[in-house]
């Protein structure tokens, strides 16, 4: 939420430099307030746990948030009852005329398949095009981030020589970016993936800002200067409470089967899998969503249909 201060206060300029929202008395008196409308394209096979994680994070805000869920129509879900989807989810044709303050596109377990070979890829392209004019700011996660970077900017993904598995440190490259307000200079997040994007292509794309990265594992968070698109390479920011369980279950499952699996890096104290894992990423996930909703609240036009005109999105 913005803070109302006197227009001549000496701290005002510094606060603006740090990306902290302020308004004067006149703006406060005429400020229009309405619920934020958020659409979630849930690509995960297990829809219900993903819903719970995202709603926990979106609900931890003083802002009123109105959430719709949608799913791909061209892919038949085998892990969620069709009647549940029919009752609680939309398909594209049902929301295509709507406008949203924010859109969230989750990951999907298809990272090792070429984009064009994913059965719902044509539908993904439709969502990406639609988002240009119907959603102010979009969060893309994991495969959703890889897919969007490929569609919008032609950035390729690549197969890693070994699975990235464990808890990894990343450093901020834009400390005062509003999406990262309150983050420490470094933060730790879980990773469990076989692919990565081509970082060199990102560096050579002037429409993109790199917000955080690591020397060991490359880029983690990317954004556009107009805040219309953010890309997060990793699942921590929507599996906040489940990642601890997921990493351990995945490790113990493969170990029990005798499959080649390394102990998740930086996960167990002294790499001892009989001890309780460290849980070091929860606060960053809450902070991340708080900051994103604040950006959306401050910058989206009150009249959502004005999104395309007032905030043209760079291609």
Name every feature range the model reports, one short phrase each.
Residues 50-53, 79-82, 115-116:
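Short, glycine/acidic-enriched capping/hinge loops at junctions between secondary-structure elements
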Residues 100, 105-174:
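Cysteine-nucleophile active-site neighborhood
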Residues 73-86:
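N-terminal beta-loop-helix "entrance" segment that forms/cooperates
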